UniProtKB/Swiss-Prot annotation:
Pathway, per record: Lipid metabolism; phospholipid metabolism
Function of the protein: Catalyzes the transfer of an acyl group from acyl-phosphate (acyl-PO(4)) to glycerol-3-phosphate (G3P) to form lysophosphatidic acid (LPA). This enzyme utilizes acyl-phosphate as fatty acyl donor, but not acyl-CoA or acyl-ACP.
Keywords, in A-Z order: Cell inner membrane, Cell membrane, Lipid biosynthesis, Lipid metabolism, Membrane, Phospholipid biosynthesis, Phospholipid metabolism, Transferase, Transmembrane, Transmembrane helix
Family as reported in the entry's similarity comment: Belongs to the PlsY family.
InterPro entries the record matches: G3P_acylTferase_PlsY
Xref: SMART domains: G3P_acyltransf
Subcellular location: Cell inner membrane
GO cellular component, one term: plasma membrane
TM annotation in the entry: 2-22, 52-72, 78-98, 112-132, 145-165
EC category name: transferase
Identification of the protein by name: Glycerol-3-phosphate acyltransferase
Superkingdom of this protein's organism: Bacteria
Entry's Gene Ontology BP terms: phospholipid biosynthetic process
Length: 195
């Protein structure tokens, strides 16, 4: 029964659409209908400004980090922890507050793995930032992160988390499917074009 509580808690917390709330409260816009129509930090930053994008990023990371860290204090069972982590990320992608729609889950995945495999996450974030800096495409950086995460999770010794990391890779590619299509057609928005 306690497992069910933790899964529901993680899913509920993951479902909270902080980006949507920030957009409505801070810049009076529905980010689901403007820009990339994503509720993530990138779209918040584009529409509302950098500081609000950072706020959305931190909150989305926290909703992955907090339930996993709390659950880890309850049990070190890797299956249990993986399920809690997955519930938080799935909550972000399929939010009960947005008719089972949501964001792309990069920030929430980062939060989950900062709690479980911080070194692997750090290295993966370095690749994410490097690709964004070089290419100008946040989506390309996110996809690079998705590929790097299982690799660094394995090589840094967090072997028990590799299946979860692989699952997150598949999910992140799925949530970025439209970005992948736009990248292939040369139609993806680049931060560099804004300068």
């Amino acid at each position: 029964m306690l497992w069910i509580f933790w899964l529901v808690f993680a899913y509920f917390l993951g479902s909270i659409p902080f980006g949507l709330f920030i957009g409505k409260i801070c810049c009076n816009c529905d980010i689901r209908t403007e820009g990339s129509k994503s509720t993530g930090a990138t779209n918040v930053a584009r529409l509302c400004g950098f500081k609000y994008g950072v706020a959305a990023l931190v909150l989305d990371v926290a909703k992955g980090f907090v339930p996993v860290l709390m659950a880890y204090q309850y049990s070190h069972n890797w299956i249990f922890i993986s399920l809690v982590a997955a519930a938080a990320v799935i909550g972000h992608v399929f939010s009960i507050f947005m008719d089972m729609k949501g964001g792309k889950a990069v920030a929430t995945t980062i939060g989950v793995f900062l709690a479980l495999a911080p070194v692997a996450t750090f290295y993966s974030i370095v690749f994410l930032l490097a690709v964004i800096a070089l290419s100008g495409f946040v989506s390309m950086g996110s996809l690079t992160f998705a590929v790097a995460l299982p690799f660094f999770t394995l090589v840094t010794g967090s072997v028990g988390m590799v299946p979860l990391a692989c699952g997150m890779t598949v999910l992140l590619f799925w949530t970025h499917r439209e970005n992948i299509r736009r990248l292939a057609k040369g139609q993806e928005n680049s931060w560099k074009k804004k300068k």
